[in-house]
Amino acid sequence: NYPLFSALGGYVFGQNDDGTYNADDVGIDSEGGLAAAQKFADWSNEGLISKDVSYDVMIDSFSSGKAPFAITGPWAVGSFTDAGVNFVVEPIPPVEGGTPEVFVGVQGFMQSAFSENPDLATTFMVDYLNTEEVQLALYEAGNRPPAMTSAYDQVSSDPLILGFGAAGQQGTPQPAIPAMSSVWDSWKDAYSLIFTGSDPVTAFTDAAAQIRSKIAEG
């Protein structure tokens, strides 16, 4: 829901001057956030969205040709190709005049401090995982663009890579701060309340209060 929420004026956390996220600035109940909540309620009342359409239902509906589009990421490509769906990847179009942002993330490898063979683990990560062969294999397995430039250059013409790249241009880094873990459950519950007829402003206001409380508790 974040792309639609952001297009309607909402945000999760504000940002400091240096671009880092400010956990003290929760935007779920900001003016834009509450306006977004009301719009979600309107869409629910019009039958455009439903709490019964889970992520899995969305994927199945698109894979079977019952839905014209799916808002998802590279991890879903395999399901669509396996189903024989003829599809393209494009940025989400404007919503109510606003540009949807997507959360952009990266994946990497970390070595455990409790590794029984730290030297071997380091060698595996640096000398094996950090090769074009492995980077390209990870791309083929998960449709994620490689971070290694020499590997990326070999797949940069892939229409899927181009599509996700274009979508990422209007994206924002997913907050990688501890406070983000306090957001998901309360925010998800607020959407469920809206989709079952609760007052949208109250739902998001209460969710924001819960999030602030969780952050304060640490």
Language model regions located:
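Beta->alpha turn/N-cap motifs
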Residues: 55, 71-77
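Short, well-structured alpha-helical segments that form the helix of a local strand-helix-strand
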Residues: 62, 200-212
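Extracytoplasmic/periplasmic substrate-recognition and gating elements
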Residues: 38, 81-143, 193, 198
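Short helix-initiation/N-cap motifs at beta->coil->alpha
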Residues: 50-63
